[in-house]
Curated annotation (Swiss-Prot):
A GO CC term assigned to this protein in UniProt: cytosol
Oligomeric form and interacting partners: Homotrimer.
Record protein name field: Nitrogen regulatory protein P-II
Native organism taxonomy: Bacteria, Bacillati, Cyanobacteriota, Cyanophyceae, Synechococcales
Keywords carried by this UniProt record: Nucleotide-binding, Phosphoprotein, Transcription, Transcription regulation
Family, similarity comment: Belongs to the P(II) protein family.
Pfam family, one: P-II
């Protein structure tokens, strides 16, 4: 099993979710996060003063899948989240040793 973590632009969430559901993914966790990278900050105005927001709002998606689904999930996220501009995000893939559904005690693939 693998855990796929994707950092995406917030307005792309619906497109990514639809693409993943259509690919058979039945669950994911979404968290609001802030960060910076090549996109840098952006200048905003507040009460007549300009200031730079260095940490930009993003969403972090966490999805645990069987190894055979990893490439499909990555392809779906990239296709749905891409704008072609700096700041589209990143995808990280990590191994998952064990998964347990707390309610039933099911483990691994049965718990996904």
């Amino acid at each position: 099993m693998k855990k796929i973590e994707a950092i995406i632009r917030p307005f792309k969430l619906d497109e990514v979710k639809i693409a993943l559901v259509n690919a058979g993914i039945v669950g994911m966790t979404v968290s609001e996060v802030r960060g910076f990278g090549r996109q840098k900050g952006q200048t905003e105005r507040y009460r007549g003063s300009e200031y730079t927001v260095e940490f930009l709002q993003k969403l972090k998606l966490e999805i645990v899948v069987e190894d055979a689904q990893v490439d499909t999930v990555i392809d779906k996220i990239v296709a749905a989240a891409r704008t072609g501009e700096i700041g589209d995000g990143k995808i990280f893939v990590s191994p998952v040793d064990q998964t347990i559904r707390i309610r039933t005690g099911e483990k691994n693939a049965d718990a996904i």
